[in-house]
Amino acid sequence: MERLLIVNADDFGLSKGQNYGIVEACRNGVVTSTTALVNGDAIDHAAQLCRDVPKLAVGMHFVLTLGKPLTAMPGLTREGLLGKWIWQMAEEETLPLDEISHELECQYQRFIDLFGREPTHLDSHHHVHMFPQIFPIVAMFAAERGVALRIDRQSVLNADDLPVALRSSQGFSSEFYGDAISEALFLQVLDASADRGEKSLEVMCHPAFIDNIIRQSAYCYPRLTELDVLTSASLKYAIAERGYRLGSFLDV
């Protein structure tokens, strides 16, 4: 049985090094898809780069934890910036959901303005769209627009609660991440998905060349290791050998 594999590189637009790494992993590796932070420092560079890489599917990486929002968000920002305090606010059930909904709409429109088309799908920086309070907002938004959505079905959600019109892969893995990146780890993710009987799988990744912005990230040098693994000829062969076809969210 042929299975669909979506290898999605998060953080398009974060920095030029990130952008170049994603494009390299698409042109010479197994990355098929990416998601863009429309408030990223290098988002204009990302939009320009992808014009020369038509096979790279581009979705939107909804941002509520980094940089400046596109709208006034007094209930979520501190000194005008987004940050990881959103986790505490979620636990305290004090998230400004109206502000978040409006910011989602504005980031979506900004994506269209930048890339000249709608995103292939939606996900989010640090998976904040999977918060129980935020997920219904993003899921309904995606369903109404016919846009696919990253869903981690294993961790949080009851599939019966999903909007009928919502498209997603059957499986999602964030396990190709950390200090132990290797081809073997990537293939373990695929084998585990196959054992669960999933017909489609998204694997998250973050391939990048190191620059000054990436150096400031808590997740820095493993991004370069990811790039090495994702561009190895042996990985592409092993994926095909396992019966996976590389594709994007346009295929789900």
UniProtKB/Swiss-Prot annotation:
Its cofactor is Mg(2+). One of its GO terms (molecular function) is metal ion binding. Keywords: Carbohydrate metabolism, Chitin degradation, Cytoplasm, Hydrolase, Magnesium, Metal-binding, Polysaccharide degradation. It is an enzyme of class 3 (hydrolase). Pathway: Glycan degradation; chitin degradation. GO terms for cellular component: cytoplasm. It catalyses: N,N'-diacetylchitobiose + H2O = N-acetyl-beta-D-glucosaminyl-(1->4)-D-glucosamine + acetate; diacetylchitobiose-6'-phosphate + H2O = N'-monoacetylchitobiose-6'-phosphate + acetate. InterPro entries: COD_ChbG_bac, Glyco_hydro/deAcase_b/a-brl, YdjC-like. It is found in: Cytoplasm. Transmembrane segments: none annotated. One of its GO terms (biological process) is chitin catabolic process. Gene3D superfamilies: Glycoside hydrolase/deacetylase. Mg(2+) binds at H61, H125. The keyword Metal-binding applies. Signal peptide: none annotated. Its EC number is 3.5.1.105. HAMAP family: COD. Involved in the degradation of chitin. ChbG is essential for growth on the acetylated chitooligosaccharides chitobiose and chitotriose but is dispensable for growth on cellobiose and chitosan dimer, the deacetylated form of chitobiose. Deacetylation of chitobiose-6-P and chitotriose-6-P is necessary for both the activation of the chb promoter by the regulatory protein ChbR and the hydrolysis of phosphorylated beta-glucosides by the phospho-beta-glucosidase ChbF. Belongs to the YdjC deacetylase family. ChbG subfamily. Homodimer. This is Chitooligosaccharide deacetylase. It comes from Citrobacter koseri (strain ATCC BAA-895 / CDC 4225-83 / SGSC4696). The gene is chbG.
